[in-house]
Amino acid sequence: MGAKTFEGGDNHEDATNALSTKSNAVGGKPRGANMLEDGDGEFGTDDDDDGDGQDSSLAVVNPEDGSKPKKRKRSKKKKSNKKKPGDGAQQQTSPPRVPLSQLFPDGKYPVGQMVKVPAVNLRRTTDEELRYLSRGTITNDEALSDYRKAAEVHRQVRHWVHETVHPGQSLTELAVGIEDGVRALLGHQGLEPGDSLKGGMGFPTGLALNNCAAHYTPNPGQKDIILKKEDVMKVDFGVHVNGWIVDSAFTVTFDPVYDNLLAAVKDATNTGLKCAGVDARVGEIGGYIQEAMESYEVEINGKVHPVKAIRNITGHDILPYRIHGGKQVPFIKSKDQTKMEEGEVFAIETFGTTGKGYMMDGPGVYGYSKDPDARNMHLPLASARALLKTINQNFGTIPFCRRYLDRLGLEKYLLGMNSLISHGIVHMYPPLVDIPGSYTAQFEHTILIKSSGNEIISRGDDY
């Protein structure tokens, strides 16, 4: 979920974090292919990983003398009862409805892609590292397990999206399907007060089409949109467990004409992930992202368009129950000297466009979120007080949308919502759009910054 900023803004609030399936994505490459090209990471290598759950490549070997192999009597193959790590008695369904607790009864969830960092100044112990170490390991291990669980939910749900999304599908059907899958896999339907704070959506499912880059979700009262073959759709959704939010996004197309646009954005996101690390400066990362992104062009309807990095939305750090922390990672080079620190979690995302590269507020409302710094104050409207109580009990500072309020059975809440917005208690998010006729794409991953090696928590087979 992109954070909107102003072009050229170099001053950002500094915040320190408390945490110091196989699918075919359109325009993407298998995870193994990326490892061969990148050469800088290993998927699923960690002290907690069993290490034998990955696919291996098989080569056909002919006899050295060139003779035909001798015929042998075939023996019946015995079915292997060996299960991969994390396999439970059940397999995931389509749509996904089997809770992860049944698929991973031991509570050990897959590790993300472990990325080695250069061995620079290993004897240095910074204040940030001391703060991280002083927090102890038990809480951190629990939080990391929650993160990995949220990431596995994201992977399994988006696998279903890759397998089933098609032209002619309504965006409401797709959004509800994603959210129903997340809630089912976590075992939290979120219909009782406090339940969705234990686990659920990290923010409303974003399904932005074409020139709309981000912050669109189908809501009550809007005309339902039907997906078309020529559409470019950004699928951006978050999953949280106990407030630890995994934020990851990808782009779906049905026409290969957009392949270069998707390749540019995927390359830019992977570049940002490679550059992330302890002491990395966000302004410099933005420069590398921009260089990768803008080395591409795409031909659409006989016209060649340079792919531009969008200037006024950014990646961001993630705090407990807060999808946008105080740090931002731009997609363009800037003078921002803000550093990444040990134990921080970032959403490294990039947006590319064939348009102007500058986002404007579009019509309508995507969703809302409570300001974490909102002061307690008297609200004159009873409807506003009742709505705020519902928000505190069900969402806290996690973003939500009108569909979620309707799902809880709320009615006639818009007057109370407007009161909360006018008092600065709740923020409203509009869709973010480029010029009409342009096309935008997005890819995003959640990464944990560690001096011993970063973990791309949300990495999967698809992207």
UniProtKB/Swiss-Prot annotation:
Residue numbers binding a divalent metal cation 2: D247, H316, E349, E444
**Residues that, per the record, bind substrate:** H215, H324
- The UniProt regions of compositional bias labelled Basic residues, in chain numbering, are 69-83
Main localization of the protein? cytoplasm
Tell me, what is one Gene Ontology molecular-function annotation carried by this entry? metalloaminopeptidase activity
Bias (Acidic residues) ranges: 37-53
One Pfam family for this entry, by name? Peptidase_M24
The catalysed reaction is: Release of N-terminal amino acids, preferentially methionine, from peptides and arylamides
Extract one GO BP annotation from the record: proteolysis
User: What EC class is this?
Assistant: hydrolase
Database matches in InterPro entries: Creatinase/aminopeptidase-like, Met_Aminopeptidase_Type2, Pept_M24, Pept_M24_MAP, Pept_M24A_MAP2, Pept_M24A_MAP2_BS, WH-like_DNA-bd_sf, WH_DNA-bd_sf
Q: Which UniProt keywords apply?
A: Aminopeptidase, Cytoplasm, Hydrolase, Metal-binding, Protease
**EC number assigned by the record:** 3.4.11.18
Location in or out of the cell: Cytoplasm
Q: Please tell me whether the keyword Phosphoprotein is annotated for this protein.
A: no
The family assignment reads:
Belongs to the peptidase M24A family. Methionine aminopeptidase eukaryotic type 2 subfamily.
Q: Which HAMAP family match?
A: MetAP_2_euk (MF_03175)
Q: What does this protein do?
A: Cotranslationally removes the N-terminal methionine from nascent proteins. The N-terminal methionine is often cleaved when the second residue in the primary sequence is small and uncharged (Met-Ala-, Cys, Gly, Pro, Ser, Thr, or Val).
Question: Can you name this protein?
Answer: Methionine aminopeptidase 2-2
Q: What organism is recorded for this protein? A: Talaromyces marneffei (strain ATCC 18224 / CBS 334.59 / QM 7333)
Its organism's taxonomic lineage begins at: Eukaryota, Fungi, Dikarya, Ascomycota, Pezizomycotina
